[in-house]
Each structure stands twice: as structure tokens, then as C-alpha cells.
């Protein structure tokens, strides 16, 4: 039996320190399903006067309506006069203290950009930035684009539609809510506070999801765990089929034989992370034997004879075993697979024992972190293997295990820490390597002490 870690596909060069926003593509169908699933447990958005709909209850980005109002003569000037405007930074008393105004021309349109500061600059996609688009040909207003998070794919598009004003909302580059009617003339939007737009649409738009959240204590807990792991990564050794057994020795997973200096493969590394929660409770790391146990109830009859030869379900059984073993130590009972798996099969495109497209992983983690903050996820990456022999159906091979820590930082920005085989990588790195594959997720409850066991021979 061989563990399926595929180290030759591991993108060590993709190591990153921080993932600020979601850039992995999320299909519209999957995103719609995620929204529907989350709506079952999140309160629906209410009217403008309710606790949810009121601007005071939401993390609305810094406002720049004061500067837009001050420059209303420019906004409504002729397109030729607008194009002649020079860039400048203006101060205001409310919202963003400083706002950069500039004009850009492209493809027959002129853009009036009111950028809020972020870091040392004024990026176009900073939260709260308004971009007004006008036609150069006739000066007509085409649309207003408003970024509502520090992410290029999370914004509002507001446009005139006859005598109506209509708004589309986008989240991570995919449609979130479309053709929301606003009860005001389009001209009023041009100088209106974002908080007013939120109020006007509170009954139709789930702003609690579209705007960034306030971090919860569970988010800070995950950030601390990620920091602990990051500090230890450089001391770990890499070794095919390597893991730590129940007595703290470095061994080969397949045989249990001692492994000299030893090291971790992807499966062994994930075990070591979960042992950081298990060992303080049990007094020792997990035993390897039970984690390798195959799920007889999951096997397909035609594939049983290939289990010993190819062990196609290893990553799935291993990650479920880690989740079950920890949960049993925490609660005293062994949970069923359905309790540790991330399924939501009634609303999401979950495939049994396969999971979700890797392409959709970061969007899925965003909603999981909003719905159930503070959880760690183990992923088993899988894809169809080559046919065992002519005329034999292709098997599904679970070949790689990853550790995922999704949380919202102190600024409310979404972060996903990805760790795999002793390295920190990223969601974009996973998508580059496994973009056409699937990942099955199990959840880990990180309550209690976190102290990964010492590794013999660590550097």
C-alpha cells in the first residue's frame, strides 16, 4: 500500500505569507447554491429599519460622498470638461479622510474615479471606491461601479434602465444578486452615501454576506494556530510515506517500520497538525493503524479487488479517520462520516466521496467561514486514475492531502492559510496544480490546547 501524495506535483515555489482576497474562479451555479445553503441558517435581510438592514449593523466601507458632492459640478459637466480634469487628493470630514479623484479614458468612455486609500496608495479596487462611467460621444451616464470589499471582484454595478435605477451585486467575480431596483433616480446615486444604497436595497440584498464581517474570537484562534504552524514549518523534514506513530516515533505509514531521521509526506503532515489537538487530550499522538482502515461501507463491489493494489481511497479514509479520532477524544463518541464531512448535498454540488471542484474551493471556504467560523478543514484531492486494465472502469484516486485554515483577519479581510507537505502555499497554487480535480473536505474542531508534538530529528 502506498500513500498517494505525488510530491513531484507539489508547488513549493508558490509559498505565500498572506492571501488577501478571493481570486479563484467560482462558478455562478455553485455560488448560487452556496448562498442558498447559507441562507438556511443566516437570518434573512430585512427592511431598512431592521437591525440587519440598518447601516449601523453592517461594516460599510469608508464613505466618500462628501468629495463627490463637492465635485458634483464636475460629475455633471460636459464630457470634454470632465476629460480635462487633473488628478488630485481631497480631504473630507466624514468617512475616508482623504480621497483621490482622477479621470481615465478608455474605449470611448470617460471614468470619474473617487478612490479611497488602502495602505500607502489609492488602488482602484479599494473598498468604498466609486467609479462613474460616462460616454465620451454624448456625455450620457452609463453606470456607477462601487467596490464594497478590498477585492477586485466584489462590487456593485448601478445603471439607469429607462426611468428606473437598477443594481447588480458581484461577489468574487461572480453574480451575487441581479437587477435589484433602487427607489431613486440614477442622478441621486452619483453623490449618495454607500450607506444610503444599502438602505434602499436592504429588503432585496443580503448585505450581511456581501460586506466584510467583523472577526470573531474563533477567527483569531485560527490565526494563532496558523502562526504556531508557520513557526514550525522550517524545522520539518520531507519524506515519502512518512508520519509520526502513536509513540512519537517517525515511521513509514505503509509498514510502520522506523524511518531513521524521518519526515512527513502530505498525509503525515496533516496527522501531525491534528495531533496538535489530539495529543494534549490523549497524552500521545494518534495511532496510525486505525487511520489506514478502509471504509467497507464505501467500497464499490467492482473496485474491491483493486483496493490492495491501488488503495484509491487512501486520502479520503485518512482524513475521515483523523477527524473521527479527534472528535471521539473530544466528545467520547465516534461520529458518523456525515458528521465530519462537508456535504450540504441538498444545496451544493457535492459528490459523495468526491467532494467539490478545486476551482470552487476558496468560494466554498468563504461561506463555511461565515456560517461556522473557526474550523480547520482537511482536504483530500482526487481525480480519475488511469484505467487499471482494458475494459475496467476508471478508478477515483485520492492522491493528496491538504490542511486549510479559513478566517477573517482583524480588518475583516478573508484569508485562507493552505499548508501541505510541510509547506505553506495558497489557493491559487492549488488551482494551478489541481484545477480540473476535486477535493473532499472534513471539518476539524480546534477547541482546546494546540501543541503539535515534538518531531524527532527536526532541523
Task: Locate each region found by the language model.
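Bacterial N-terminal signal peptides that target proteins for export
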Residues: 11, 16-32
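Bacterial N-terminal signal peptides
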Residues: 28-42
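Cysteine-nucleophile amide-bond enzymes
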Residues: 48-459
